[in-house]
Amino acid sequence: MSGVLIAVAALLALAAVFGAVLGFASEKFKVEGDPIVDQIDSLLPQTQCGQCGHPGCRPYAEAIAEGEEHNRCPPGGQDTVVALSELLGREELTLDDEGAEDANVAKVAYIREDECIGCTKCIQACPVDAIVGAAKLMHTVIVDECTGCDLCVEPCPVDCIDMLEVKPTLQTWGWQRPAGIGERPDSRIEVVNL
C-alpha cells in the first residue's frame, strides 16, 4: 500500500513542478499581439469567406494593419469600410466589390433538395455552419445563419446550390436615407421592431 502512495505522491510532485515551470514560461516568454489587429478583426464579419483575397478575417485584419486597403470585404459592406476608416484614421473608401456580383444585394444559398446527393462537400465549405444534413441525405440551408458568401456553390458536384436574392420582408425592410447625410443614397435605415 505504501508503494502506491509513494507513486501517487511522486506523480503529484512532478505535476506541480511541471505546472509551475509551464506557468513561469508562459509569463516569461509571452508574445504580445498587435492590439490594432484585434480591433480590426473585431469589426470584420467573421464569415471567413475569402472574398477579400485572404484565407479568413484574421489574415485580412493583419494585412490591413500592415497597410493594405480596408475596403475589400463584401459581406461586411460599406458599414464595415466606414468603421475601419474611423478606427484607422484613414480616408473613407467605397466598397471594392470586384469579384462580388452585387455587394448591395443580400443573397442566401438555396439547395435544390431533390437534386442533392448528400456528399457533404457544401457542409465542409460553409464557414458559418449554415448548412445541415448528413452523408447520403439531402442538405438544407439555415437562412438566418447564411452570410451569402457563396463558398458552398463551387464544391457541389451536382450544381444544386443557387444564390438567391433575399427579398425585403416586413422584418428587413427599411426607408431609404435622405441624400446628404453622409451615407450613400441607396442605403437603408434600420427598422427596429418593438
Swiss-Prot record:
Domain 4Fe-4S: 32-90
UniProt keyword annotations, A-Z: 4Fe-4S, Cell inner membrane, Cell membrane, Electron transport, Iron, Iron-sulfur, Membrane, Metal-binding, Repeat, Translocase, Transport
GO molecular function terms noted in the UniProt entry: 4 iron, 4 sulfur cluster binding; electron transfer activity; metal ion binding
InterPro entries from the UniProt entry: 4Fe-4S_dom, 4Fe4S_Fe-S-bd, 4Fe4S_Fe_S_CS, Elect_transpt_cplx_RnfB/RsxB, RnfB/RsxB_Proteobac, RnfB_subfamily
4Fe-4S ferredoxin-type domain: residues covered: 107-136, 137-166
Cofactor: binding details: Binds 3 [4Fe-4S] clusters.
Domain of life of the source: Bacteria
EC number: 7.-.-.-
Record localization: Cell inner membrane
Binding positions ([4Fe-4S] cluster 1): 49, 52, 57, 73
Named cofactor requirement(s): [4Fe-4S] cluster
Function field: Part of a membrane-bound complex that couples electron transfer with translocation of ions across the membrane.
Family per record: Belongs to the 4Fe4S bacterial-type ferredoxin family. RnfB subfamily.
Protein name per UniProt: Ion-translocating oxidoreductase complex subunit B
Organism of origin: Alcanivorax borkumensis (strain ATCC 700651 / DSM 11573 / NCIMB 13689 / SK2)
Record lineage: Bacteria, Pseudomonadati, Pseudomonadota, Gammaproteobacteria, Oceanospirillales
Gene: rnfB
